Amino acid sequence: MKDKIAIKKLGTIDLGIVESNPIVFHNELYRFEYIRNGKHRYRHNSIDESYFRLIRVADEAVLPAFGHGLHLGNAFVWKDRIIVTAVEDWGKSRFYQLESTNLYDWTKPEVILEHPSWQGYNTSLCRAENDFILTFELGAPAELVKVPFTMFFARSNDLKTWHIIENTSFGRDFYTGGPMLRYFSPWFYFFYLHGSYENGFQEYVARSRDLKEWELSSRNPVLSSDDDDRILAYPFDAAEIQQIRDAVNINNSDLDMCEWQGHLHMTYSWGNQRGTEFLAQATANCC
């Protein structure tokens, strides 16, 4: 087995946030966050619905909320646009897209993919040659999804109209979750969650030239839970610190990353994969 990529964990920055990803927009680092409502409501969510927000990492400034009522979002930057893809709700059949050019004014969410039999969840978007490739996560129907969850793919050449790429998928025979898709010619790299409640959940990576035939990395797993997840990287109060110290930790999930100042800036989640979860940061050298 090859040596592991050296990922340095920087510590926990929030409680109750799972789906998040870093982006660079106009030479500034931001963190996109999905703020939950309902059973696992974010402790600072003062409204009766989910939403998205951006954090300017340099000073932790919170930008205005957007995407109200949508779920499980993911942000992608293309030139002077921030594109966010999301699902109608956990396990619902419609995927949406909205965008902004200034971080404050957002377009009306538009349906980009839907099917009445789908149970939709997470998405991830990347640029590949002259197209854009979107991966979307489904939990049903059974004829498509053998072992929940399974990832499927769509293509667009204009970031408006999306077409499903026939006969492409990942993870029909084993558990996958929390996708991150990247492209470095000629390979697609797919980061995903794999594991179980009995043995723990870890981040894995696979690659493919065509989104059909996949090769698992010899370096898997690439990210696993350990005590460094509990490093305090934010001025939490005493009760929050105690919650971090006492939490069951069987999971490193929802890894995402971007290049920033010569390094990879990463976000990921840790916790029990049942609602007691934490947002953390990490870094690695660009290979």
PLM region descriptions:
Residues 1-287:
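Carbohydrate-active catalytic/glycan-binding domains of CAZyme proteins
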